């Protein structure tokens, strides 16, 4: 959540930053402006009544000490106290309304994030490994998966509906091996392996920014205050929800393998074949909680950690700086890693490493103590990596003319 003090002091500066996202936010910002104005008005009235109460109380005390008649002052104090209680309640309600309006406003755009309207304006930073020159026309992953009997798309539809898959046989062994390899690499780079619940309550999803704005994107358990996690970012970050961390314990680096569940609202017609876009998928996530001065360096570290896995699997990829119009809700700055898919003849996102600055920390009340003062941490998250998409990239990049798949040396020991 954006700093309320900043909004109260300089609303226009905040609005200018948010408009860099190129979203139609005028209505939301106007409603927030009105809520802030109402809160300020109520607060000023309350402070006026409190000042009056203090003044009359002082007069009452003086007259009492002088044994003078205080009946009028007593009545005035009683009447004012009733007004104070009513106005205090109104101020509390106005504050809640302001915070509700504020909770659906995305993070401020980082100064390092380039301006742009959409993914078309994202900027390539660098390429790593050169795509292979094929002597035959490369197939897409779903053709290879079916040919090798690794992925059963029809059974996924039968068991659930579209955008679900069944992985079996040697394909399942590769899938499992990829998870183990990713966790081992992440652990080697200093990230603690953690297994968390796949269900969380509403407060946790608020903390990382999925709720209340993106309720349609997550699966809710009927008649329960529980949701299936869209990413382990939610559980790992919220392990420290409402926590004060000693500065000596920063940074905190965590990794987790979890199933992830997304409704993919608004994705109708996109990537309808194969494993690129699924309602349920596995992901190995990185989350870091850092001192504000260290978050930029941590973002680079997380990117290199994810890239290291792709290099070990001999998968060409590139770093892409997201522009302001393509940022996620909680992100202030994001760099994607896109992997080359020869079957599609294009790069596709396989990791997204975001620095949310203190946006999530403010929502989730994650603080650190330094010099006897509590301050907000910075939180970062990123995939390392999306398992299904990594398997897709492995199949397409390492396919042979006969449809068989070459196994990279780094993966052999896990099979």
From Swiss-Prot:
UniProt-recorded Gene Ontology molecular function terms: ATP binding; serine-tRNA ligase activity
Catalyses which reaction(s): tRNA(Ser) + L-serine + ATP = L-seryl-tRNA(Ser) + AMP + diphosphate + H(+); tRNA(Sec) + L-serine + ATP = L-seryl-tRNA(Sec) + AMP + diphosphate + H(+)
Swiss-Prot/TrEMBL GO biological process terms: selenocysteine biosynthetic process; seryl-tRNA aminoacylation
EC code(s) of this entry: 6.1.1.11
Annotated residues for binding of L-serine: 231-233, 285, 383
Ligand binding (ATP): 262-264, 349-352
Gene3D superfamilies assigned: Bira Bifunctional Protein, Domain 2, Serine-tRNA synthetase, tRNA binding domain
Predominant place of localization: cytoplasm
Keywords tagged on the record: Aminoacyl-tRNA synthetase, ATP-binding, Cytoplasm, Ligase, Nucleotide-binding, Protein biosynthesis
Quaternary data: Homodimer. The tRNA molecule binds across the dimer.
UniProt free text on domains: Consists of two distinct domains, a catalytic core and a N-terminal extension that is involved in tRNA binding.
PANTHER family (UniProt xref): SERINE--TRNA LIGASE (PTHR43697:SF1), SERYL-TRNA SYNTHETASE (PTHR43697)
Function, as annotated: Catalyzes the attachment of serine to tRNA(Ser). Is also able to aminoacylate tRNA(Sec) with serine, to form the misacylated tRNA L-seryl-tRNA(Sec), which will be further converted into selenocysteinyl-tRNA(Sec).
UniProt family annotation: Belongs to the class-II aminoacyl-tRNA synthetase family. Type-1 seryl-tRNA synthetase subfamily.
Name of the protein this chain belongs to: Serine--tRNA ligase
Lineage of producing organism: Bacteria, Pseudomonadati, Campylobacterota, Epsilonproteobacteria, Campylobacterales
Gene, per the UniProt record: serS
């Amino acid at each position: 959540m954006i700093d309320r003090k900043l909004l109260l002091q300089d609303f226009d500066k905040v609005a200018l930053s948010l408009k860099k996202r190129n979203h139609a936010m005028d209505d939301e910002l106007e409603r927030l402006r009105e809520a802030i104005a109402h809160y300020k008005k109520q607060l000023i009235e309350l402070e006026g009544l409190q000042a009056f109460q203090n003044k009359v109380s002082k007069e009452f005390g003086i007259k009492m000490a002088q044994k003078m008649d205080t009946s009028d002052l007593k009545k005035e104090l009683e009447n004012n106290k009733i007004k104070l209680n009513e106005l205090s309640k109104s101020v509390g309600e106005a504050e809640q309304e302001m915070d509700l309006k504020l909770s659906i406003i995305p993070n401020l755009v980082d100064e390092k994030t380039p301006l742009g309207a959409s993914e078309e304006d994202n900027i390539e930073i660098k390429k790593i490994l050169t795509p292979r020159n094929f002597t035959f026309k490369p197939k897409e992953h779903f053709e290879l998966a079916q040919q090798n009997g690794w992925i059963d798309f029809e059974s996924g539809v039968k068991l659930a509906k579209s955008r679900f898959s069944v992985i079996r046989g040697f394909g399942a062994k590769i899938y499992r091996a990829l998870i183990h390899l990713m966790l081992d690499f992440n652990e080697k780079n200093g990230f603690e392996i953690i297994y968390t619940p796949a269900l969380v309550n509403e407060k946790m999803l608020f903390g990382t920014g999925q709720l209340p704005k993106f309720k349609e994107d997550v699966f809710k358990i009927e008649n329960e205050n529980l949701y299936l996690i869209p990413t382990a970012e939610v559980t790992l970050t919220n392990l420290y929800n409402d926590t004060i961390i000693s500065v000596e314990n920063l940074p905190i680096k965590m990794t987790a393998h979890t199933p992830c569940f997304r409704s993919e609202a608004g994705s109708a017609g996109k990537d309808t074949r194969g494993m690129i876009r699924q309602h349920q998928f596995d992901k190995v996530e990185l989350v870091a909680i850092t001192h504000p001065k260290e978050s930029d360096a941590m973002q680079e570290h997380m990117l290199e950690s994810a890239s290291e896995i792709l290099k070990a699997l001999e998968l060409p990829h590139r770093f892409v700086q997201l522009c302001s119009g393509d940022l996620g809700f909680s992100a202030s700055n994001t760099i994607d890693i896109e992997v080359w898919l020869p079957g599609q003849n294009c790069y596709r996102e396989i990791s997204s490493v975001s620095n949310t600055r203190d946006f999530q920390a403010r929502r989730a009340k994650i603080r650190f103590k330094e010099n006897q003062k509590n301050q907000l941490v910075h939180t970062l998250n990123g995939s390392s990596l999306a398992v299904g998409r990594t398997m897709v990239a492995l199949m397409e990049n390492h396919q042979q003319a006969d449809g068989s798949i070459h196994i990279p040396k780094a993966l052999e020991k896990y099979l």
